[in-house]
Amino acid sequence: TPTKGWNEAEFSKSFKYYINIVSNADMPHVYTLYAANGKAVRTLEDNAALKAKLEDYAVAKKEFIQIPAADGTTLLNAWLMKPVNFDASKSYPLLIVQYSGPNSQQVSNSWGMDWTQYLAQEGYIVACIDPRGTAARGEEFRKCTYMQLGKIESDDMIAAAKWLAGQSYIDAKKVGIWGWSFGGFMSSLCLMKGNDVFST
């Protein structure tokens, strides 16, 4: 597809047609009907009204980066969301949001707007990190947590938090971590093991 971002396809029963769904961090979902030969038949939904509405607001953008893992060699995929009025000469509180569960993926160039946007509007920097054990990085990366679930992921999250806390625009005394389900377990583990970096 010509658009960079997250793509998925839903095929008709006969496989003569498919709907391509594409989005990226700056573009809401676009649904396009294609023939099996790859020729676009028509756009079903382009979310033009939503795009136009968003232009009325100052929306914080996701910045995709890589952060060193605890092993010192692996780079972890991450995104940062800074306040719209970000000033590099200031230091901001940081909240890391993560799930970190086996074969999951939270860092992707796909559309989504949730409460993290509100935090950025309120002067927080938000980071999302996929540690080792998560998906879309190959078999070795995904399976390295086998029989030691929670160890490598928490080590990576603590290392990433320390790296971020070392950036001049982060207030190293105000670094928090949050997650749900497996991410809640990870948050608790990181607070216990990494209490020298996490304050909440």
Stretches with model-predicted labels:
Residues P2-T3:
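Surface loop/turn motifs at the tips and blade-to-blade linkers of beta-strand repeat domains
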Residues N7-T200:
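Serine-hydrolase catalytic core recognition
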